[in-house]
């Protein structure tokens, strides 16, 4: 799969290697952008645009990886659970706030990362396409 289709298209399947390459590219991109924009304290288009590009790219990579595991893109909504746990932690105190705000989001994100990045692909063609592909730089 050509790199820009792998990073920005919601169609097709992406294998584990492609998932980790895309995840790593987004991480490096955000790391570079964070160091460039670190002095800016006001949210402007220049500071928000890299975040939106990376968010869109990560969403496309995750959805294609879900397709490779023979799952629907609707399952990406499970990412709302850690966010809701974090928000709910502000309404509690003590150990419950720590459990909801730190432990649950980390646990859920770890399980999701294992699901998407470590488990094998669906071996046969499915409704989302042929066997999952990785990145090509052409």
Residue ranges and their predicted role:
Residues 1-25, 58-74, 113-138:
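Membrane-interface extramembranous regions at the lipid-water interface
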Residues 29-57, 79-112:
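Membrane-helix interface segments in multi-pass membrane proteins
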